[in-house]
Amino acid sequence: MRVAWLSSRQSQRRFLLSAILSAFTVWFLLPSSPKHEEQPAELARQYPMLWRHVHTFNGTGGAWYIPPSWLSSTDVQPETIVDAALLASQAAKSNKNRFIDHSNIPLLLHQTWKNRRVEKWSDLLRASVEKWLHYVVADDMAYFFWEDDGIERMLAEFEPDFAHRFGFLPSNVERADVFRILVLKWFGGIYADVDTRPLRQPTSWVSSSDLAPWSDSVTQMRFSFDNPVSSILGIEADCAPHKSDYWRMGYSYPVQLTQWALASSAGHAVLLRFMDNLQRRMDGVARRNRGNINTPEAIKELRQIGPLCLTGPVAVTVAVKTWLEERTGLRWNALTGSGDGGRSKLVEDVLILPITGFRTRQIRQYGLEAGHRPLSSSLAPGARIVAHLRPESRVRESLSDLVWVVQKLVEAARLTRSQATIEEGGRVFHYA
């Protein structure tokens, strides 16, 4: 009877786990914002800036907008998006008002998507890009919407030695990750995914309070910097380092950065470090595959590394973490906002925003300590951007939630198992 009872409990747990996994799978596949085509006149009325500056724009490699005040009468109108980005980055240098406040970061916004046919887009994407363009025009910013042809032109002109490897990255996810680093490396500015929406003007992303000196509560090391900010990054995971929450949620570090939004001056060292790390990793894969990165075995090895670690948030975190540690002696986990209400921290010329800075619609509150402010409102203090996440992005974002749930179920199973160890007549019975 006892063994049968234990077997029944085990079956119940297995059924519960199976049901939860099935529910997660179904939820992942549900679309968050259905696509539907609308008439051109209606699109032009609802999204006037998107219609004018993206959909109907006639350019090679993408669409762009450069404020008329940035151009002189002698400037030749660019024919490609690469020429336009180069022109705008040079024009920004001639006027201190063409930078984010307190920074060396030019007011250039870069976005990319597979096409400019906005009638095929979801309402979410249309509204998000329209909001960005509203700020672009109001703040006298330059804007660049990169298509595949434009990205290929940029690689051919600025990264000829890497261009062939770019094509051998396992998927479009990795290629998009690398693009955002390279476009900032060469032109500077802000990169933001098309499913994000700004909550405040990019010109005001850096305030005087963000520049205040701060100290590591463990080492007492003090950090201050008098020169302008040259890089802005946001935290996506802020977990207690002495607990296992972060890896249960699928993160590699207790404090981990995001890369769906970032800003930088051109040629910043953390961007160079990211590319050096990627090149070194791809060199190693090629070396183990007879010097070729394009063999099926090499591609398989790159896939096994995974986008998160190869080019995604983990790769960005490693690049920033190692550079700041070497440069300043920073203790990485000192960047947590759990003990100070989530304040920004400036290290060298890199500004690290708290988890509320670049945020998703629903931040995982179980990854936060009680010291953080409530995050239920989209107007969380200090928020610059909110990410709404497309269905394909929701899968990637929610994998960590799935890992966390599974880990909790495993813990519960272990606890039940220990409680169900029964001693009878000098014998100990365990369920398998």
How should these model regions be labeled?
Residues 2-176, 192-432:
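Glycosyltransferase-associated regions of secretory-pathway enzymes
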Residues 177-189:
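Small-residue hinge/turn detector
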